[in-house]
Amino acid sequence: MAMKVDLILVLLNSLFNIQACTGQGRIERGKIDVAEHIKKEASVPLDTSINGIILDDTVSLNNILGKRLPVIDFSNYGECTVCSNIDGTEILILCVNYGGYINQYDKFVVVPSHSIIQPKRIRQTLLKKFCSGLGAYIGCDIKEIEKQMMMMNKVQYKTAEGVEIVYSQSLPDWPYHCEYHFMNNRLIRYEFDCRDP
């Protein structure tokens, strides 16, 4: 009889372990569901790609832009690769990940081509526009993407051209930072990076 009770207890314990590992069964009161906890803690989705090119990922970049991209030393950005869209109206600056692999970049900046001094070596792409993973693109209306930015820090500046609104976010436990600059409710610049401070 004692052996049957022990066997039943072992089987019940195994069943509870299987349910815990597969996520089946009820969550007891007072215990934390990790997936739900992460969803609650992340204030906004993170923007980490432009046209499928992912921060710090060499494979996605090689598939979209090619294996060897020219690296230049460009103004305030350091070593980077500068790309333009097909008609040359937008510039994508890919900043080199120091200590990383070839074609590994840890900062992306997108600006209109008229807003910066153009470097001599620009890689022209076949992309019509540079669009981020969350739908941001140069010239988009603030209303198109403000839902993703509701929990970000917001700062307004008065300039000669009008009011500039900057949404930004930094994560305390991960080296990630993003900024979206709007002038007259239109996106004029955006950038994100995953660099250690």
Predicted features by range, described:
Residues 1-28:
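Bacterial Sec-dependent N-terminal signal peptides
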Residues 22-161, 171-174, 182-197:
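Short helix/turn-capping signatures at newly exposed starts of structured segments
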Residues 165-166:
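Conserved phosphate-binding/catalytic loops and adjacent sensor/switch elements of nucleotide-binding enzymes
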Residues 179:
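Conserved catalytic or metal-liganding residues and their short signature motifs at active sites
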